[in-house]
UniProtKB/Swiss-Prot annotation:
Main subcellular localisation: plastid
PTM-bearing positions, type N-acetylthreonine: 15
Protein name: Photosystem II CP43 reaction center protein
Propeptide boundaries: 1-14
Any one GO molecular-function label of the UniProt entry: metal ion binding
GO cellular component, one term: photosystem II
Gene: psbC
């Protein structure tokens, strides 16, 4: 469909290239973008852009289903999940599927069902994506005005924003319903070493929930990443889901105020940049969450956190040397500080040695040994249970270090053990991807602002190597 207005008016960004190549009628002449600019050619073709997005969703869901089944096929129930390089099954186990006391996997069938459901969904999405990319209407405005839009239409854009917020709110409530009514979720803090339980006593106090947002992000405080009980996590999802749904209704029913109309750039590329910025923030927060938090990401499935492995090693050697007759309360280490125990700056009794920097750690296997002033010496002498020794020895030897140099005193393996913790994978990948998304946010924000100001002419492509090559067609 040849558009009626001058594209240059809407695309001050010129992309110079071999303009003769036409791909399915969406060539450079009609769109202002060459074939390699991908979906930019579809900016004003709402029907085709829908196809691209649905097909992309299909690819995502296909990966989830296929990877899920791959992990099920390779899963060995006798080994912990974190020893098997799994990144999807730990998420399903955390939601309470297939696991029992202590995080032991008792049934892999729910995991199989999850994989199959995702595969079937991906087929539906894939069909829809191909249909809308190849067969469906190029634009939706004429035939399906509810689904059509113009990027400059501020009211329509905030309506779409509202619909998205409502869907996110429903997603948050799905976790709430799973925890409250549909079998519960895995609680690493359940007495006796973790179990699946229904959450009955939600934390809905705004001072507690929003108190997390007001905390310092630094050690001992840890902002929202410091959440360490499921009541707060599920209660937070009630608040978040409610805010998203109410905000969604608000954005559907209202038009942007004058200050908002002035403050934002209202173009497709601007919305892309806002979305990328939000995803970058999500990525950075997820990175910190999976690295430091052992409640939302239980160590039974993801392996210990770095601080947890370090403290576990200190605990393991305290147990060993105490059995050999050491007086762990008074033994002096090579620095003159306590070898096994010392005091934190605020007076608590903490583990000595290099792990002192991780004295904030809270973990289910360690908390029973604490008293009102930190670690309780009499409990360390009389109350250590075999399950605590086993778990700390296991965590000590499965630190999520990769090849870090600063390891909190953990004895590292150089060439014997082939082990990378899922925490390392998930934290690193989310940091790196979050950073890429942040760069994309800056790039597209700059282009969108320049285009809105009317002075962006694109990159000078006179020396583009591709210009000297034979045209593809």
């Amino acid at each position: 469909m040849k558009t009626l207005y001058s594209l240059r008016r809407f695309y001050p960004v010129e992309t110079l290239f071999n303009g003769t190549l036409a791909l399915a009628g969406r060539d450079q002449e009609t769109t202002g973008f060459a074939w390699w600019a991908g979906n930019a050619r579809l900016i004003n073709l709402s029907g085709k852009l829908l196809g691209a997005h649905v097909a992309h969703a299909g690819l995502i869901v296909f990966w989830a289903g296929a990877m899920n089944l791959f992990e099920v096929a390779h899963f060995v129930p006798e080994k912990p999940m974190y020893e098997q390089g799994l990144i999807l099954l730990p998420h399903l186990a955390t939601l309470g599927w297939g696991v029992g006391p202590g995080g032991e996997v008792i049934d892999t069938f729910p995991y199989f069902v999850s994989g199959v459901l995702h595969l079937i969904s991906s087929a539906v999405l894939g069909f829809g994506g191909i249909y809308h990319a190849l067969l469906g209407p190029e634009t939706l405005e004429e035939s399906f005005p509810f689904f059509g839009y113009v990027w400059k239409d501020r009211n329509k854009m905030t309506t779409i924003l509202g619909i998205h917020l409502i869907l996110l709110g429903i997603g948050a409530f799905l976790l709430v319903f799973k925890a409250l009514y549909f079998g519960g979720v895995y609680d690493t803090w359940a007495p006796g070493g973790g179990d699946v339980r229904k959450i009955t006593n939600l934390t809905l106090s705004p001072s507690v929930i929003f108190g997390y947002l007001l905390k310092s992000p630094f050690g001992g405080e840890g902002w929202i990443v410091s959440v360490d009980d499921l009541e707060d996590i599920i209660g937070g999802h009630v608040w978040l889901g409610s805010i998203c749904i109410l905000g969604g209704i608000w954005h559907i029913l209202t038009k942007p105020f004058a200050w908002a109309r002035r403050a934002f750039v209202w173009s497709g590329e601007a919305y892309l940049s806002y979305s990328l910025g939000a995803l970058a923030v999500f990525g950075f927060i997820a990175c910190c969450f999976v690295w430091f938090n052992n409640t939302a990401y239980p160590s039974e499935f993801y392996g210990p956190t770095g601080p947890e492995a370090s403290q576990a090693q200190a605990f393991t050697f305290l147990v060993r040397d105490q059995r050999l007759g050491a007086n762990v309360g008074s033994a002096q280490g090579p620095t003159g500080l306590g070898k096994y125990l010392m005091r934190s700056p605020t007076g608590e009794v903490i583990f000595g040695g290099e792990t002192m920097r991780f004295w904030d750690l809270r973990a289910p296997w360690l908390e029973p040994l604490r008293g009102p002033n930190g670690l309780d010496l009499s409990r360390l002498k009389k109350d250590i249970q075999p399950w605590q020794e086993r778990r700390s020895a296991e965590y000590m030897t499965h630190a999520p270090l990769g090849s870090l140099n600063s390891v909190g005193g953990v004895a590292t393996e150089i060439n014997a053990v082939n082990y990378v913790s899922p925490r390392s994978w998930l934290a690193t990948s989310h940091f790196v991807l979050g950073f890429f998304f942040f760069v994309g946010h800056l790039w597209h924000a700059g282009r969108a602002r320049a285009a809105a100001a009317g002075f962006e002419k694109g990159i000078d492509r006179d020396l583009e190597p591709v210009l000297s090559m034979t045209p593809l067609n």
